[in-house]
From Swiss-Prot:
Induction: By sucrose, glucose and fructose. Down-regulated by ammonium supply. InterPro entries: Gln_synt_N, Gln_synt_N_sf, Gln_synth/guanido_kin_cat_dom, Gln_synth_cat_dom, Gln_synth_gly_rich_site, Gln_synth_N_conserv_site, Glutamine_Synthetase. Homooctamer. The gene is GLN1-3. Expressed in the pericycle in the region of mature root. PANTHER family: GLUTAMINE SYNTHETASE, GLUTAMINE SYNTHETASE CYTOSOLIC ISOZYME 1-3. It comes from Arabidopsis thaliana. Its main location: cytoplasm. This is Glutamine synthetase cytosolic isozyme 1-3. The lineage of its organism: Eukaryota, Viridiplantae, Streptophyta, Embryophyta, Tracheophyta. Changing A174S: 4-fold increase in affinity for ammonium and catalytic efficiency. Pfam families: Gln-synt_C, Gln-synt_N. SUPFAM superfamilies: Glutamine synthetase, N-terminal domain (SSF54368), Glutamine synthetase/guanido kinase (SSF55931).
Length: 354
């Protein structure tokens, strides 16, 4: 095993000028992440300088077998924490050979919204709180839980310390450092209310880059859990009953919200979100009705509400924002399996263009 480990960690910099680029894209379910690698002649820092590539869309549920070619367009580059050196991770979106975005390419429409002059001048910032649950590989049950049984009730696990409370911290810390190495704007991590459940935060990040970074952070988490023999679940309610679900709260602000008088702009934006509550809920993740019950720090899925420091509301305004009269708000409705391209662009579209 030592030879294998040595080869996996081999530094290519002194041996060749070539690099490895891992192309990443979203598969047919809209939640599965795919990737494959190719050799490039030298370092690349600009995604527009990278070659387009293709893959077999019939094997990802994104094309028919008789016309299976789907084209990858490189969109963002990150440093590769696994191969290190000049090797890179490349976030891509997917198109037909004719150049049309395929149905699961949600980035394309998001980029159009973020490039709208009225949106661009507002410089929308996002902070995504990505919750997830670490599951035992063969039994689909959270790590640290007795198979077929339950741990003690919630209470000691949120931000907890100790082997009986913080289950999976080695994976969480490895992911944290991998994100920092890659150049992702990860701003923190914490243990969540349900044991085996964790959260990382990405942001503040502006515009389309928020979606790119959350997707690559998810990719890194999938790779690290792959190495650890653990499954990462983004199910919004992985365990029924008196256990917290998993969300992806979206903190949001625009330039006018961050400036003096911004609180009134925030209130108007929240009013616009209320008018389109059903449309947003429909786009905020699969199975969210199991999570948004009005319990476990959620609002009821059928009712829009907002409040200051209220974690049982659809939208929360922080005490600091209220005190300073400017800042940001938190949309608490998105599920952990939401598409960040969809959620971030939809919030901008509703609050700025709506």
């Amino acid at each position: 095993m030592s030879l294998l480990s040595d080869l996996v960690n081999l530094n290519l910099t002194d041996a060749t000028g070539k690099i490895i680029a891992e192309y990443i894209w979203i598969g047919g379910s809209g939640m599965d992440i795919r990737s494959k690698a190719r050799t490039l002649p030298g370092p690349v820092t600009d995604p527009s300088k990278l070659p387009k590539w293709n893959y077999d869309g019939s094997s990802t549920g994104q094309a028919a077998g008789e016309d299976s070619e789907v084209i990858l367009y490189p969109q963002a580059i990150f440093k590769d924490p696994f191969r290190k050196g000049n090797n890179i991770l490349v976030m891509c979106d997917a198109y037909t050979p004719a150049g049309d975005p395929i149905p699961t390419n949600k980035r394309h429409n998001a980029a159009k919204i973020f490039s709208h002059p009225d949106v661009a001048k507002e410089e929308p910032w996002y902070g995504i709180e990505q919750e997830y649950t670490l599951m035992q590989k063969d039994v689909n049950w959270p790590i640290g839980w007795p198979v077929g049984g339950y741990p003690g009730p919630q209470g000691p696990y949120y931000c907890g310390v100790g082997a009986d409370k913080a289950i999976g911290r080695d994976i969480v810390d490895a992911h944290y450092k991998a994100c920092l190495y890659a150049g992702i704007g990860i701003s923190g991590i914490n243990g969540e209310v349900m044991p085996g459940q964790w959260e990382f935060q990405v942001g503040p990040v502006e515009g389309i880059s928020s979606g790119d970074q959350v997707w690559v952070a998810r990719y890194l988490l999938e790779r690290i859990t792959e190495i650890s023999g653990v499954i990462v679940s983004f199910d919004p309610k992985p365990v029924p009953g008196d256990w917290n679900g998993a969300g992806a709260h979206c903190n949001y602000s625009t330039k006018t919200m961050r400036n003096d008088g911004g609180l009134e702009v925030i209130k108007k934006a929240i009013g616009k979100l209320q008018l389109k509550h059903k449309e947003h809920i429909a786009a905020y993740g699969e199975g969210n009705e199991r999570r948004l019950t009005g319990k476990h720090e959620t609002a009821d899925i059928n009712t829009f509400s907002w409040g200051v420091a209220n974690r049982g509301a659809s939208v929360r305004v922080g005490r600091d924002t209220e005190k300073e009269g400017k800042g940001y708000f938190e949309d608490r409705r998105p599920a952990s399996n939401m598409d960040p391209y969809v959620v971030t662009s939809m919030i901008a579209e509703t609050t700025i263009l709506g």
